[in-house]
Swiss-Prot record:
This protein's name: Kinetochore protein Spc25
Organism expressing this protein natively: Mus musculus
Alphabetical UniProt keywords: Cell cycle, Cell division, Centromere, Chromosome, Coiled coil, Kinetochore, Mitosis, Nucleus, Phosphoprotein
Gene name of the record: Spc25
Region (Interaction with the N-terminus of SPBC24): 1-146
Gene Ontology biological process: attachment of spindle microtubules to kinetochore; cell division; chromosome segregation; mitotic spindle assembly checkpoint signaling; mitotic spindle organization
PANTHER family in the record: KINETOCHORE PROTEIN SPC25, KINETOCHORE PROTEIN SPC25-RELATED
Family classification: Belongs to the SPC25 family.
Subcellular location(s) per record: Nucleus; Chromosome, Centromere, Kinetochore
Length: 226
């Protein structure tokens, strides 16, 4: 074989080697590309499956929670049903007691109305009596130096003057009212008189109010001179 033929053979061998290596490089690149694509696909599939599993777990938990809630609701409904049935039975068993209670309430209402009317009548009578006392006060004022004022609590305040000759305008006073028993009730005086309780007892027995006022005035005069 001549040199030209050897050179041509070597050239052919080299060209074939280059083509083979290029083909191997291309195949290797394709294999690597396929491997990477497969990895990406598997990763995406794995993530998708993981999300799906988590979603299924969440749905399972929700279903279990719903079942638990449903059981609780059913239990509560059953308890309420039993309570309602019990209440119905109690109501049916207490119909007579309810009627008696209604009658008792009506009786109490009527009694309250009677008492309210009695109190109202007593208050009106007391007001009329106080008005009478106030009217009498106008007469006493000119002759005994007495002034009568209505103060809080439906009380009357009796104020005497011309008791002390040295100070005729100096006030001497006591207060009184008519209690629920329609009796005179005397309160403290200024200055204090030890005989107030005695005078109160006497006017309750005699109902002589003029004498009562005269005795109070005399007691104040005696206190000034003593």
């Amino acid at each position: 074989m001549g040199e030209d033929e050897l050179a041509l053979l070597n050239q052919s061998i080299n060209e074939f080697g280059d083509k083979f290596r290029n083909r191997l490089d291309d195949n290797h690149s394709q294999v690597l590309g396929l491997r990477d694509a497969f990895k990406d696909s598997m990763k995406a599939f794995s993530e998708k499956m993981s999300l799906k599993l988590k979603e299924e777990e969440r749905m399972t938990e929700m279903i279990l929670e719903y079942k638990n809630q449903l059981c609780k609701q059913n239990k509560l409904i059953q308890e309420k049903k039993e309570n309602v049935l019990k209440m119905i039975a109690e109501v049916k068993g207490k119909e007579q007691e309810s009627e008696e209670l209604t009658a008792k309430i009506q009786e109490l209402k009527e009694e309250y109305a009677r008492k309210r009317e009695t109190i109202s009548t007593a208050n009106k009578a007391n007001e009329e009596r106080l008005k009478g006392l106030q009217k009498s006060a106008d007469l006493y004022r000119d002759y005994l130096g007495l002034e009568i004022r209505k103060i809080h609590g439906n009380k009357l305040q009796f104020i005497f003057t011309s008791i002390d000759p040295k100070n005729p305008e100096s006030p001497y006073m006591f207060s009184m009212s008519i209690n629920e028993a329609k009796e005179y009730e005397v309160y403290d005086s200024s200055p204090h008189l030890e005989c107030l309780a005695e005078f109160q007892e006497k006017v309750r027995k005699t109902n002589n109010f003029s004498a009562f006022l005269a005795n109070i005035r005399k007691a104040f005069i005696a206190k000034v001179h003593n």
